[in-house]
């Protein structure tokens, strides 16, 4: 049985118990949300996960970190280090998005070492193999679509991005759209290219039932990818984006009927004033399914600092109901991220998630804020560092300019906390 099927039958799995304990909620709440499809618990039957996560309504906002190789940069050891650092700094899941080297070796190695759920985009493998053999990114068969899904499932992947909403109808509209950037989703572009080359419908859409059978066999959580997501704020919230969303909304019901866990992926470039509308519309059309957003970025002019833009958009999106934030690194739109970029990206998105949790009244988040306030009141630096996401940076800065008495070198003897304590 899948986690959803177990939940519907009143069965409480070990993973449900673990996430309930982490969230600080009764396990019955976890079971109920999973049964309704308003939350997902990604866990392939073949992957042993030490730190499972629950994503969805009523639970803390989660953060995903993307790692993976690219042409000219395909070191397995570097990817393993990225994974280690991402997890150390609080990533709730990883996605392996490699496009060069031995893709299966890299994927299996990350799954084996990861204590958190691991996701992937199977269509990348089809495109990479096609390019390496034929120098053509979309020269592969319909069978390859599903063979790669099975291969990823067998390797223990817990959730998969499947760009099922890129249909012929949606694609016809994009050709005549006024978008500056027509398609920016790599998976969406690969599938669109294949459809145009072969004059065929998207196999993932046409044979969605077959995809559901595979997902059910392994208990893969399907993340319905937004291949038509806007790639710039000037293209946000257009007809192409929403038409694809309506297709995805229809397929949510099909997945639930099959007992397959499903979530929706959302836009990555959205002006701040449109974030609430996008999140609420996704929740409505997706019938309450969890929402997985890339960012979102509320400006396109933050190159080198896109992780900061991401944190701003992500905090607001999380407040309005987004459940799962995919991090963005300082290298976004520039280059393949290195280990330091991964660290910075995770911290930025974790800050966004925490800000959203506090604003949403999450009990655990508020308890930690109270602990930090008390630590500051008592000048308990070690507790302050331990509660901070960037504890190593905070400690380094404190030690670089030490102050011999209570307080720090910012205020010295003019510390407001000390003065208030002395004269109150």
UniProtKB/Swiss-Prot annotation:
Superkingdom field: Bacteria
Keyword 4Fe-4S set for record: yes
Coiled coil: none
UniProt-listed Enzyme Commission number(s): 4.1.99.17
One Pfam entry name: ThiC_Rad_SAM
GO CC, one annotated term: cytosol
Key word Zinc present: yes
InterPro entries: ThiC, ThiC/Bza_core_dom, ThiC/BzaA/B
GO biological process: thiamine biosynthetic process; thiamine diphosphate biosynthetic process
Pathway annotation from the record: Cofactor biosynthesis; thiamine diphosphate biosynthesis
Co-factor requirement: [4Fe-4S] cluster
UniProt-annotated binding residues for [4Fe-4S] cluster: 408, 411, 415
Binding-site residues, Zn(2+): 269, 333
Enzyme superclass (EC): lyase
GO MF annotation terms: 4 iron, 4 sulfur cluster binding; carbon-carbon lyase activity; zinc ion binding
Catalytic activity: 5-amino-1-(5-phospho-beta-D-ribosyl)imidazole + S-adenosyl-L-methionine = 4-amino-2-methyl-5-(phosphooxymethyl)pyrimidine + CO + 5'-deoxyadenosine + formate + L-methionine + 3 H(+)
Cofactor binding, note field: Binds 1 [4Fe-4S] cluster per subunit. The cluster is coordinated with 3 cysteines and an exchangeable S-adenosyl-L-methionine.
NCBIfam families assigned to the protein according to its UniProt record, in alphabetical order: PRK13352.1, thiC
UniProt function note: Catalyzes the synthesis of the hydroxymethylpyrimidine phosphate (HMP-P) moiety of thiamine from aminoimidazole ribotide (AIR) in a radical S-adenosyl-L-methionine (SAM)-dependent reaction.
HAMAP family: ThiC
Family stated for the protein in its record: Belongs to the ThiC family.
Name of the protein in question: Phosphomethylpyrimidine synthase
Organism: Thermotoga sp. (strain RQ2)
